[in-house]
């Protein structure tokens, strides 16, 4: 009898994740998020009422069956390390399951920080080789999406690829922020350019370009050879998008994996949700997406749960103040430990332990944990950073000139408020 197990998709979906290790690149500064990343790495930024951004990549790994994970850290890593220790320490080491933290560190062979994404992996090769994985999945730790990496691994193996790059169409006018590729009918990558000034449009859709998601699958031995060679190339930027992927494409060894094949959706919903929340506007908008009646990203999906650190908090409370005004919310996410007293909260996201005192009006605003909103405040189109104490009567989002003088105001009119900004008033 012929054994076809090695070609059975269900068998491959179980086996390939067990033969893989995921490396999450989580050392980025995220400078476009301004004050939100002054004291924390971008992957550690709060998102969606109770999560951190990195929870999406970590949850995708777990749900895909990948339980050997390395998180490569560098910039302002304490908050990120603390979150992973508290929320992701439940894997069973006896079953060779782990989330390893791989910080930048002084080594005999190097005297510098990570110089690029490829160098970040290269500097940890001594550790990564000990994992004895057949496949290495490289992930960005700062995107919001749900994806089954096992489907990408199957695609990689069935094509006999050395490297597979996840991709999706993006509007042509936005494509200069991504790696852009051209592919043939079999999805072999023919050309790749990192953040080109003039992105190549898709042949069948000239208003769109095919962009890299920053998600790669490599045959492990091939990756190690590439990294060793790149390490010894003096003029390299030591970056996957700028150096390694173009080199692999020139050798015709790279294949594209359309996000449509591995995007996780709920029920009849076919929206392929992926967001780079690298700017304040994108971050604000993606948070408020979750507060809509039918959000494109379903975080309530029991079949693909997004995990995070769990806090023991009392339920959110909406109370009547002494004047008889009721605490009310509409189209909003309100987390545990919040108290809304005699105020109205509309289309907003309140993270844990937010206190909204009486007579406030809050609209289209994201409020991070431990914020106190004083009486009679009016907030509109804001992001309030953690542990801010807004004084009584503060108005934000109604006067552009005043907002720009006191806080950071984006071109689209989103206002960021941090503790350091409040201390200067």
Swiss-Prot record:
A Pfam family annotated for this UniProt entry: NTP_transferase
InterPro entries: ADP-Glc_PPase (IPR011831), ADP_Glu_pyroP_CS (IPR005836), GlgC_bac (IPR023049), GlmU/GlgC-like_hexapep (IPR056818), NTP_transferase_dom (IPR005835), Nucleotide-diphossugar_trans (IPR029044), Trimer_LpxA-like_sf (IPR011004)
Alphabetically ordered keywords of this record: ATP-binding, Carbohydrate metabolism, Glycogen biosynthesis, Glycogen metabolism, Nucleotide-binding, Nucleotidyltransferase, Transferase
Record keyword Isomerase present: no
Binding site for alpha-D-glucose 1-phosphate: 114, 179, 194-195, 212
Gene Ontology MF terms: ATP binding; glucose-1-phosphate adenylyltransferase activity
Superkingdom in the source lineage: Bacteria
Known pathway: Glycan biosynthesis; glycogen biosynthesis
Catalysis: reaction(s): alpha-D-glucose 1-phosphate + ATP + H(+) = ADP-alpha-D-glucose + diphosphate
EC number in record: 2.7.7.27
Keyword GTP-binding: no
GO BP annotations, alphabetical order: glycogen biosynthetic process
NCBIfam families per the UniProt record, alphabetical: glgC, PRK00725.1, PRK00844.1
Stated role: Involved in the biosynthesis of ADP-glucose, a building block required for the elongation reactions to produce glycogen. Catalyzes the reaction between ATP and alpha-D-glucose 1-phosphate (G1P) to produce pyrophosphate and ADP-Glc.
Assembly notes: Homotetramer.
Name of the protein in question: Glucose-1-phosphate adenylyltransferase
Protein's organism: Pectobacterium carotovorum subsp. carotovorum (strain PC1)
């Amino acid at each position: 009898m012929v054994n076809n197990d090695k070609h059975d998709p269900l068998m491959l979906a179980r086996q390939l994740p067990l033969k893989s290790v995921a490396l999450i690149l989580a050392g980025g500064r995220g400078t476009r998020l301004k004050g939100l990343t002054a004291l924390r790495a971008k992957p550690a930024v709060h998102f969606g009422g109770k999560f951190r951004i990195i929870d999406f990549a970590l949850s995708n790994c777990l749900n895909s069956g990948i339980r050997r994970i390395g998180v490569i850290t560098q910039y302002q890593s304490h908050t990120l390390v603390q979150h992973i220790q508290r929320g992701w320490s439940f894997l069973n080491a006896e079953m060779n399951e782990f989330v390893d933290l791989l910080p930048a560190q002084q080594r005999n062979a190097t005297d510098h920080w990570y110089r690029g994404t490829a160098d970040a992996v290269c500097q940890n090769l001594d550790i990564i080789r000990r994992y004895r994985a057949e496949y290495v999945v490289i992930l960005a730790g700062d995107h919001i999406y749900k994806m089954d990496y096992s489907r990408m691994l199957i695609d990689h193996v069935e094509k006999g690829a050395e490297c597979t790059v996840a991709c999706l169409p993006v509007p042509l006018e936005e494509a200069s922020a991504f790696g852009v590729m051209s592919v043939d009918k079999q999805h072999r990558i023919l050309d790749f350019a990192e953040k080109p000034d003039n992105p190549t449009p898709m042949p069948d859709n000239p208003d769109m370009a095919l962009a890299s998601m920053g998600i790669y699958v490599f045959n492990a031995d091939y990756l190690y050879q590439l990294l060793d060679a790149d390490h010894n190339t003096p003029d390299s930027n030591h970056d996957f998008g700028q150096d390694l992927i173009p080199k692999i494409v020139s050798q015709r060894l790279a294949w594209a994996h359309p996000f449509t094949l591995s995007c996780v959706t709920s029920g009849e919903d076919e929206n392929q949700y992926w967001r780079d929340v690298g700017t304040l506007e994108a971050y604000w908008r993606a948070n408020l997406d979750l507060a809509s009646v039918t959000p494109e990203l379903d975080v309530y999906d029991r079949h693909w749960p997004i995990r995070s650190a769990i806090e023991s908090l009392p339920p959110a409370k909406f109370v009547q103040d002494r004047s008889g005004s009721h605490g009310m919310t509409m189209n909003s996410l309100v987390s545990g430990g919040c108290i809304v007293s005699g105020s109205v909260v509309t289309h907003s996201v309140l993270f844990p332990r937010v206190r909204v005192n009486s007579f406030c009006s809050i609209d289209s605003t994201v409020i991070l944990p431990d914020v106190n909103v004083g009486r009679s405040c009016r907030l509109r189109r804001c992001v309030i950073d953690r542990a801010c104490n807004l004084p009584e009567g503060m108005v934000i989002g109604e006067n552009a000139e005043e907002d720009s003088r006191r806080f950071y105001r984006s071109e689209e009119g989103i206002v960021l408020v941090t503790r350091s900004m409040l201390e200067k008033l």
